[in-house]
Swiss-Prot record:
<feature type="binding site">
    <location>
        <position position="291"/>
    </location>
    <ligand>
        <name>NAD(+)</name>
    </ligand>
</feature>
<dbReference type="InterPro" id="IPR000534">
    <property type="entry name" value="Semialdehyde_DH_NAD-bd"/>
</dbReference>
<dbReference type="GO" id="GO:0009056">
    <property type="term" value="P:catabolic process"/>
</dbReference>
<dbReference type="InterPro" id="IPR003361">
    <property type="entry name" value="Acetaldehyde_dehydrogenase"/>
</dbReference>
<dbReference type="InterPro" id="IPR036291">
    <property type="entry name" value="NAD(P)-bd_dom_sf"/>
</dbReference>
<dbReference type="GO" id="GO:0008774">
    <property type="term" value="F:acetaldehyde dehydrogenase (acetylating) activity"/>
</dbReference>
<dbReference type="Pfam" id="PF09290">
    <property type="entry name" value="AcetDehyd-dimer"/>
</dbReference>
<feature type="binding site">
    <location>
        <begin position="13"/>
        <end position="16"/>
    </location>
    <ligand>
        <name>NAD(+)</name>
    </ligand>
</feature>
<dbReference type="InterPro" id="IPR015426">
    <property type="entry name" value="Acetylaldehyde_DH_C"/>
</dbReference>
<keyword id="KW-0058">Aromatic hydrocarbons catabolism</keyword>
<keyword id="KW-0520">NAD</keyword>
<protein>
    <recommendedName>
        <fullName>Acetaldehyde dehydrogenase</fullName>
        <ecNumber>1.2.1.10</ecNumber>
    </recommendedName>
</protein>
<feature type="active site" description="Acyl-thioester intermediate">
    <location>
        <position position="133"/>
    </location>
</feature>
<keyword id="KW-0560">Oxidoreductase</keyword>
<dbReference type="GO" id="GO:0051287">
    <property type="term" value="F:NAD binding"/>
</dbReference>
<feature type="binding site">
    <location>
        <begin position="164"/>
        <end position="172"/>
    </location>
    <ligand>
        <name>NAD(+)</name>
    </ligand>
</feature>
<comment type="similarity">
    <text>Belongs to the acetaldehyde dehydrogenase family.</text>
</comment>
Length: 313
């Protein structure tokens, strides 16, 4: 007997939406594609979806609601923009109040979800926010330190290939920094978080690189390092191209020579530096676009776990 699957629609037929569609078609265990929704009739994503036998519309969320199979759609991934997501969520809830929304924009109208850190707490949420690519890569590392020692401050720098940043990413730079900074605090456990994104124009394009600086209370270095390595291995379960680029680095900040952190004041304790790289699985996007791959992989892992819980309830 075939396993029952939940039907998913994707709004946004750009880089992220198309990669996500291919992941669901190839690897969906509890999910299957129901519809691909865009606003550009000439988009490659819609053409690809049609070729793969997926229902499509270029009329946005209204087009989705008008599709004959809309009644069967259980989960909607939104890969548009922060502003569009707010409208999409409101409109879909007018028609189907209980629909599940997985938000891949920085809108964050629902609670943040970083699968390896807090997915089990989000299984009943009707709208979850996948933070940002930088957040999905770095917040697990902040949380790894946080479970060993109190984290006073965490700063992340996400460097992504300029070529992998489509119009949606570029339009949402401010939202990226705000949402990631907030999630570093809410999910990562830092008292204060800061996020910086760098679009690297290098050719040939470089894979995603992330640097995480964590200032915490004094702690056992071996315990912190073990926690970080364990967390990295957990992320690799759904993002195989995620890895520590080099050994974790530690610096003691003595009370006699404290750091001055804006908004926090003087700090002494342990500084932990983590260097990451994320290579994409190259399902649709090139391997250098690890920043987009980690978003689609995290979104799929989240929706699969939610679908599994719903189907076995």
């Amino acid at each position: 007997m075939a396993t029952r699957k939940l039907k998913a629609a994707i709004i946004g037929s750009g880089n992220i939406g198309t990669d996500l569609m291919i992941k669901i078609l190839r690897h969906g265990k509890h999910l299957e594609m129901g519809a691909m929704v865009g606003i550009d009739p000439a988009s490659d994503g819609l053409a690809r979806a049609a070729r793969m036998g997926v229902a499509t519309t270029h009329e946005g969320v209204e087009g989705l609601i008008s599709l004959p199979n809309f009644a069967d759609i259980d989960v909607v991934f939104d890969a548009t923009s922060a502003g569009a997501h707010v409208k999409n969520d409101a409109r879909l809830r007018e028609v189907k109040p209980g629909i599940r929304m997985i938000d891949l924009t920085p809108a964050a109208i629902g609670p943040y979800c970083v699968p390896v850190v807090n997915l089990d707490d989000r299984l009943d949420a009707l709208n979850v926010n996948m933070v940002t690519c930088g957040g999905q890569a770095t917040i697990p590392m902040v949380a790894a330190v946080s479970r060993v020692a109190k984290v006073h401050y965490a700063e992340i720098v996400a460097s992504i290939s300029s070529k992998s940043a489509g119009p949606g990413t570029r339009a949402n730079i401010d939202e990226f920094t705000e949402t990631t900074s907030k999630a570093i605090e809410v999910i990562g456990g830092a008292a204060k978080g800061k996020a910086i994104i760098v679009l690297n124009p290098a050719e040939p394009p470089l894979i995603m690189r992330d640097t995480v600086y964590v200032l915490s209370a004094a702690a056992n270095r071996a315990e912190v390092e073990a926690s970080i390595e364990e967390m990295a291995a957990a992320v690799q379960q759904y993002v195989p191209g995620y890895r520590l680029k080099q050994k974790v680095q530690f610096d003691e900040i003595p009370a006699s020579a404290p750091l001055n952190i804006p908004g926090l004041g003087k700090f002494s304790g342990l500084k932990t530096s983590v260097f990451l790289e994320v290579e994409g699985a190259a399902h649709y996007l090139p391997a250098y676009a690890g920043n987009l791959d980690i978003m689609t992989s995290a979104a799929l892992a989240t929706a699969e776990r939610m679908a599994q819980a719903a189907l076995t309830a």
